[in-house]
Amino acid sequence: VVMVQKEVAERICAKPPRMSLLSVAVQYYGEPRIVARVPAGAFWPRPKVDSAVVAITPQHPSTQAPEHLVETEHFFRVVRAGFSQKRKQLWHNLSAGLQLDPINVKAVLKEVAGNEKIRAEELTVEQWKQVLRCWGAQVLK
């Protein structure tokens, strides 16, 4: 449980199409939810922003089916590449950032998301995992 600025709490708990590297990172490890909003007037001296309390329910690997597990280091390597240039289409960021064939990247995105022109902020955490599973060891090079 943490208290952060309201805007940060909203970014942590975001769903597609408003995902960010922060929301993907937190949601990889657990399920966040805003449990309370705290107005700026509740503090002295009064800050310029409202706050929110975020509770994160951890997701332990032992509770996940084996087909849903991915290597953490590789997962974040792919996600960081995907969010490297926010307004670019995801296939461009992944092919450039991971030195992968653009045609292969587009095919995987079409399979996972149904759209090869998707942007990073439009994928769920599970879809990011599916992308990584489709490539397997290919992105480890």
Regions inferred by a protein language model and the residue ranges of each:
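Class I S-adenosyl-L-methionine
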Residues: V1-A120, Q130-K141
